[in-house]
Amino acid sequence: MATERYSFSLTTFSPSGKLVQLEYALAAVSGGAPSVGIIASNGVVIATENKHKSPLYEQHSVHRVEMIYNHIGMVYSGMGPDYRLLVKQARKIAQTYYLTYKEPIPVSQLVQRVATLMQEYTQSGGVRPFGVSLLICGWDNDRPYLYQSDPSGAYFAWKATAMGKNAVNGKTFLEKRYSEDLELDDAVHTAILTLKEGFEGKMTADNIEIGICDQNGFQRLDPASIKDYLASIP
């Protein structure tokens, strides 16, 4: 009963020291589509499952992997509408930085500012936490970066990670397969294999999305390129 009294209050701690609404937001992430991020020696890859609930759905009308700036990409696990708002805000942050300083925003600066926005939604009245975790990848200072930001506003730098449904199995798989010597193509293969760990049904170029970032910038792979990668995996 004590927990129930605090479960609908965002700004009140429970007696055990928890913000229960944050735990609910993390539950939304844990039930969301699996997403994976892997740093390679010459780039970084992010990938996610993007299954459609109906064959009548217009494929590729809504993307889960999004470009934020020329050298930064983002993917999520959790609630799609919340993600759309964060994509919009992240792009605005990147553009404002460029207009102010006349140079592209560093990946770490973007992550910090997006995470600050997410944190503000954990201690403000009349709002709720974002029901998403983000993987933000990018390239600057001649090297790749990969960060994860959670509904609490906490963020971490990773070499490789998985989130969403079956995240524990995904991380276990990555711990066995990851190497800092991975080339970008090998990292894409590893990301696909990680998604396959908990994938139900047949994986095709239409039900996963992949983004890569290297010294040439960020791009979301088209279905034809993904199909080629899938063909090379037994």
Swiss-Prot record:
SMART domains the UniProt entry points to: Proteasome_A_N (SM00948)
Keyword field contains Acetylation: no
Keyword field: Cytoplasm, Nucleus, Proteasome
UniProt xrefs under InterPro entries: Ntn_hydrolases_N, Proteasome_alpha, Proteasome_alpha-type, Proteasome_asu_N, Proteasome_sua/b
Pfam families linked to this entry: Proteasome, Proteasome_A_N
GO biological process: proteasome-mediated ubiquitin-dependent protein catabolic process
Protein function: The proteasome is a multicatalytic proteinase complex which is characterized by its ability to cleave peptides with Arg, Phe, Tyr, Leu, and Glu adjacent to the leaving group at neutral or slightly basic pH. The proteasome has an ATP-dependent proteolytic activity.
Full protein name: Proteasome subunit alpha type-2
Organism field: Drosophila melanogaster (Fruit fly)
